From Swiss-Prot:
Superkingdom of this protein's organism: Bacteria
Purpose of the protein: Translocates 4-amino-4-deoxy-L-arabinose-phosphoundecaprenol (alpha-L-Ara4N-phosphoundecaprenol) from the cytoplasmic to the periplasmic side of the inner membrane.
A Pfam family it matches: EamA
Encoding gene per record: arnE
Keyword field: Cell inner membrane, Cell membrane, Lipid A biosynthesis, Lipid biosynthesis, Lipid metabolism, Lipopolysaccharide biosynthesis, Membrane, Transmembrane, Transmembrane helix, Transport
Entry GO MF terms: carbohydrate derivative transmembrane transporter activity
Annotated pathway: Bacterial outer membrane biogenesis; lipopolysaccharide biosynthesis
InterPro entries in the cross-refs: EamA_dom, Flippase_ArnE, Small_drug/metabolite_transptr
Principal location class: membrane
Organism (species): Shigella dysenteriae serotype 1 (strain Sd197)
GO process annotations (BP): lipid A biosynthetic process; lipopolysaccharide biosynthetic process
NCBIfam families: PRK15051.1
Protein name: Probable 4-amino-4-deoxy-L-arabinose-phosphoundecaprenol flippase subunit ArnE
Quaternary structure note: Heterodimer of ArnE and ArnF.
SUPFAM superfamilies assigned: Multidrug resistance efflux transporter EmrE
Amino acid sequence: MIWLTLVFASLLSVAGQLCQKQATCFVAINKRRKHIVLWLGLALACLGLAMVLWLLVLQNVPVGIAYPMLNLNFVWVTLAAVKLWHEPVSPRHWCGVAFIIGGIVILGSTV
């Protein structure tokens, strides 16, 4: 159950980061303030909840194991950037993502 909490904390952290990115997207000048407040508010909510869940994880998992698992954020953000904003990702970047996943598997299997 705690590993599910860790994944959820990671996803909420990523959601907060993606909301920050969305806040920077261009909108009409008369809607800009509302747009920024909405997305930054959502970012704060996601990041705040992620922090609470992260504290629960740290109560149950050694920090040396739990912290590297947050590298999942790099994977989630890359996937979201491609899907949501159609950002290009180089083969070298995908190779790095594969190494991150490999590292997470290796570190996670030591528990």
